[in-house]
Amino acid sequence: MRSTFLFLLIALMAACSPGSPDATDGNDNPTDTIEDDVVETIYDPAVSWAACGSGEGDHPCNIIATDHNGDEFDLYANYGSLVVLDLSTMWCGPCNSAGAHAQEVQDLYADQDLIYVTVLIENREAMPPTEADIQQWVSDYGNTTSPVLAGTRGMLVSSGGTWELTSWPTFFYIDREMVIRDVDKGYSATEVLYSIEWLLAL
């Protein structure tokens, strides 16, 4: 029984490493085939602060994109609010578990002016998510006021971006001064609530 549990745990961890199957061709080159309806994401690392990054104590780099409702989302426009930023993929099991609770968490802390944002970096085929992918995620998990955005691997440090990830999902807890206060790798419903309560107490 113990060996079966250990095998499943290792398999789950491997499934959600930052690399993904089918994301490269035989020459280890990204297969950047883009579907016609891929959602264009504007990723703007230019900021009004001296520098931005993805570590604790950093101002995050801005993310500007169209959310699942067709509204523009601008991370910096949420200055003064608390932000839970969840970088996920559609093919990752724990990411789906997190997605199933995103709206619930958003509703739970709505009175504290908290926003829970999901950025999907890849779809189930390890490709940039399309509008149809975003809408499928929203349909599956009931997002209404909790924004779901399409991202790309270009956002990640491994691809020349500024968001450092070593596992899926990765959560960034951002305070009212737009400073990253905590970074959590992987998903635990209890840990998400604990980190939010800690953020509220700052």
Predicted regions and their residues:
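Short, internal strand/loop/helix patches
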Residues: V117, A132-T170
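Thiol-/selenol-based redox modules, centered on thioredoxin-like
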Residues: S167-L202
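Ser/Thr-rich, Pro/Gly/Ala-heavy low-complexity intrinsically disordered linkers and tails
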Residues: M13-A46
